[in-house]
Regions:
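P-loop NTPase motor domains
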Residues: 35-53, 276-279, 292-299, 380-381, ...
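Extended, folded cores of ATP/NTP-driven motor/assembly subunits in large transport
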Residues: 1-410, 420-421
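Charge-patterned, long linear interaction tracts outside catalytic cores
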Residues: 125, 439-445, 450-452, 457-470, ...
Length: 815
């Protein structure tokens, strides 16, 4: 019953002396791929299958477990900075909350594939014949010893080395198309224990002891060590197995494919991919594939054709009509014969077995019904053969044989490639900041926002900038706040531009980090006059000069292409820059000193702003010193009474107050440049809420590109929070954005624009529907590897939900 005879590294010998080499196929991301990309993957897998002209292939999809505690502990190693103790405590509390919600482990589907190694024919010589006879005799002795003593298995070193050479060639061949990892004894141990119902152990933490004793020309292992992972009481019933361990019991049932009654059209036939999303419980699948060479396959097909023709002739001679089944079968067999004859491809005898387990019989019945219904919808009829449970159970062992021939399906490589083996939805990193879980797979999603600039293998971007887009109320500000908060806890530094003054109460709502929160509230009080003057706020004089030009041209509407006015304004700003007393009020004085009609005109225009509402924040006489410090871990800059224009308002329609408000945003955002140029070893975030307000004006667009480019060099990420992906879709900016978050949108043009921004098919109706149907707190995420998926943002803690919630409070009923 137990087929394994010997294990060495990733090689497994069975009782028939067949040798298989096993690998883990590193899963590839399959979500949101276009049809064209899916066909590329399909073709690669078809070639992987078709390159073996003979032998057997054994593919397993196993629902392993990964430890939440282990991931969280790894995340703690990433924490640095002044808030380290708070962060460690927060992660520990987070761990306990997650464990209480979903248990110690979460399901993690892994894909294993084994190839039978075929011995190449040796030249017949006296030496090889002697060696063969000696090996046969030795094998006989070993078998006698094993039968009599039943305590050890001996494997000649020559035999091991011969197959190891073959395995190296095979590995070199298959790794050109997909990423593979060789299995080891721990993998096999886990696999066998898993099949026998053992759970609760994380895959990474599992250890399997298989001691070996080296002799002069052979290696011994104990039979007991080999079968130890199978220790458990197995009771077989007609349609299920009961597996009992010391501390637990489980019930297992096996399905196999009875018939495929319709076409499985690709793409949409990826069973391995869809069942990960469909089932809330773990399901394992085994594909035992025997390769039938082209000549043998053609011969089988032609024999079948003769049988069908005989049936047709018999019906004709007896005067009855040939049944439609026979006619259809004749058409199919003709097509298959032509196809095999032209392509010279092999055929494959497939034994497809599904394993369903549950803690009790009622739950097992419910799960079995769910699995059966899922396959029914795909035109695949499953059957649970009575009395064959143990036999089907054995098909999951590495190097196992096909148990039963009654349910074999003859398929081509196209069919096997279309099942989506190895396809999964992957998002984010293995460790880092926990932001929520994948809506499709339920797996936790972790991010490391500072990782992009490290040039990690597999990433498709080295941009630290991020974009949060979506219509009002979808959750973009909440998600943005959560990521900034945890980035600060993990050792980063942040400055948040808060135009709507939504974060003013963070010191009260986030008491554990209150000492590191610095809220700069720039009111229109007279004592704040001149605090946002470019010459006051910028350390670098050159930066101050260019910002002064930007602000004054923005307010007055003077274009740099205006040959009369611009040179006059430029000259006045240059004169102030070179003087000892620097401030925007001196620009007015300098223009009046010029005393030409144009200069007086510009001076009067600028002067008209100086006492308008909160504009005095921008104008100083040079006596004001910079009072804005950004030395804390979390800095929030607010300007009271800002009035931002509506999203659809054109620049020409801006009112004076809106013009001034956007000018303030441009000044503060430019001030962030100084923050970006601080300590390069610390990851920094410049968070621009309502970014659309200045991305829609020329000066703001130039500034955003400047911030992003400076950020990449100085390990700083610029976070754009805006309502439309169109604001960040311009080529110069789009290519410099790494992480992308898109929240719900209902406008079809906006949806298409967002999908295009993500680089996925904008005309695909399924993609459009996914974005339109997102619930509050759900977003489409594109990670640093270009993978796209849907995430449910999960703050875990009630206090964070309260702190980051920007919705207006619900009015309580008056009693």
């Amino acid at each position: 019953m137990f087929p394994i005879k010997y294990i060495d590294n990733n090689l497994v010998w069975n009782k028939d002396n067949e040798v298989f080499a096993y690998y883990e196929l590193i899963p590839y991301n399959y979500s949101f791929l276009s049809a064209e990309q899916k066909f590329i993957v399909h073709d690669s897998f078809r070639q992987l299958i078709a390159q073996s002209r003979e032998g057997k292939i054994h593919a397993l999809q196993i629902a392993t477990e990964s430890s939440i505690r282990s991931i969280q502990e790894q995340s703690k190693k990433l924490v640095t900075g002044r808030l380290r103790d708070v962060a460690i405590q927060k992660i520990d509390e987070q761990t306990e909350a997650l464990v209480s919600m979903i248990g110690d482990n979460q399901v993690d589907y892994r894909f294993f594939i084994g190839f039978k190694l075929i011995v190449t024919e040796e030249k017949v010589s006296l030496e090889s014949m002697k060696k063969s006879a000696f090996m046969t005799f030795k094998e006989f002795l070993n078998e006698v010893n094993h039968t009599l003593m039943n305590d050890f298995i001996s494997m000649p070193d020559d035999e091991i080395n011969r197959y190891m050479k073959m395995e190296k060639l095979l590995e070199n061949k298959i790794s050109r198309r997909f990423k593979f990892r060789r299995l080891d004894k721990n993998d096999f141990g886990y696999l066998i224990e898993h099949i026998y119902g053992r759970d609760g152990v994380a895959y990474e933490d599992y250890e399997y002891s298989l001691p070996k004793k080296k002799l002069k020309k052979a290696t011994l292992i104990k039979q007991y060590d080999l079968i130890r992972p199978t220790r458990c009481l197995v009771e077989e019933s007609q349609r299920y197995l009961r597996l009992e361990h010391e501390d637990s019991e489980s019930f297992v049932s096996y399905f196999t494919v009875n018939a495929i009654v319709g076409e499985l059209d690709f793409p949409s036939s990826e069973i391995f991919y869809f069942q990960q999303q469909q089932f809330t419980f773990p399901v394992d699948t085994s594909m035992n594939v025997e390769i039938v060479g082209n000549r043998k396959a053609l011969s089988t097909v032609r024999n079948k054709k003769k049988e069908l023709k005989d049936l047709d002739n018999h019906a004709y001679l007896s005067g009855s009509e040939t049944s439609s089944n026979v006619v259809d079968a004749l058409d199919s067999v003709d097509e298959l014969e032509t196809d095999l004859d032209q392509s010279k491809e092999s055929m494959y005898k497939l034994s497809y077995v599904i394993r369903v387990s549950a803690p009790d019989l009622d739950e097992l019945k419910r799960r079995c019904d769910e699995v059966k219904d899922f396959y029914d919808d795909l035109n695949v009829k499953l059957v649970r053969p009575a009395g064959d449970m143990l036999g089907l159970h054995s098909e999951f062992f590495p190097a196992s044989k096909r148990y039963i021939n009654d349910y074999v399906q003859y398929v081509k490589s196209d069919f096997l490639a279309g099942l989506g083996f190895g396809a999964t939805q992957q998002l984010g990193e293995n460790t880092g900041i926990y932001i929520g879980y994948s809506v499709d797979t339920g797996r936790n999603v972790y991010l490391q926002p500072s990782l992009a600039s490290q040039g990690v293998k597999g990433t498709v971007t080295n941009a630290l900038a991020s974009a949060f887009v979506g219509s009002l109320g979808g959750g973009k500000s909440f998600c943005n706040n959560l990521i900034v908060y945890y980035s600060v806890l993990f050792g980063g530094q942040a400055v948040i531009l808060d135009p709507k003054s939504e974060r003013g109460n963070w010191k009260e709502t986030l008491p554990e980090i209150a000492h590191e929160i610095n809220i700069v509230n720039l009111t229109s009080d007279k004592e704040n006059a001149g605090l946002l003057d470019p010459f006051v706020i910028m350390k670098n004089v050159k930066d101050a000069e260019s910002l002064a030009i930007d602000i004054l041209t923005f307010l007055t509407g003077i274009s740099s292409r205006d040959g009369e006015k611009f040179p006059v304004l430029r000259k006045a700003v240059r004169a102030v820059t070179q003087s000892d007393q620097r401030g925007l009020l001196h620009v007015i004085d300098e223009l009046r000193r010029e005393d030409t009609a144009i200069a007086r005109n510009i001076a009067d225009h600028i002067d008209s702003f100086t006492d308008y509402d909160f504009a005095h924040l921008l104008f100083s006489d040079g006596s004001v010193s910079n009072a804005i410090s950004l030395d804390n871990q979390l800095n929030i800059i607010q300007v009271a009474d800002l009035v931002l224009p509506d999203k659809d308002t054109t620049f020409e329609e801006y009112t004076t107050i809106e013009l001034l408000s956007v000018a303030m945003l441009i000044v503060i955002s430019t001030f962030a440049l100084d923050f970006i140029h601080s300590d390069r070893s610390i990851f920094k975030i410049v968070d621009l809420d309502e970014a659309w307000a200045f991305l829609n004006v020329a000066q703001g667009e130039t500034l955003s590109n400047k911030l992003v480019r400076a950020g990449r060099a100085m390990q700083a990420g610029v976070y754009f929070v805006t309502q439309s992906s169109g604001d960040v879709s311009k080529e110069s900016l789009k290519n410099n954005i790494g992480l992308k978050f898109a929240f719900r949108s209902t406008d079809i043009n906006e949806i298409k624009q967002t999908l295009e921004f993500f680089g996925i098919d904008k005309d695909d109706e399924n993609n459009q529907k996914r974005l339109r149907d997102l619930e509050n707190g759900q977003c489409m995420l594109q990670d640093l590897y270009g993978r796209v998926g849907v995430v449910q943002i999960h703050p875990v803690f009630e206090e964070l939900l309260h702190a980051f919630d920007t919705r207006p409070p619900v009015k309580s009923e008056v009693e």
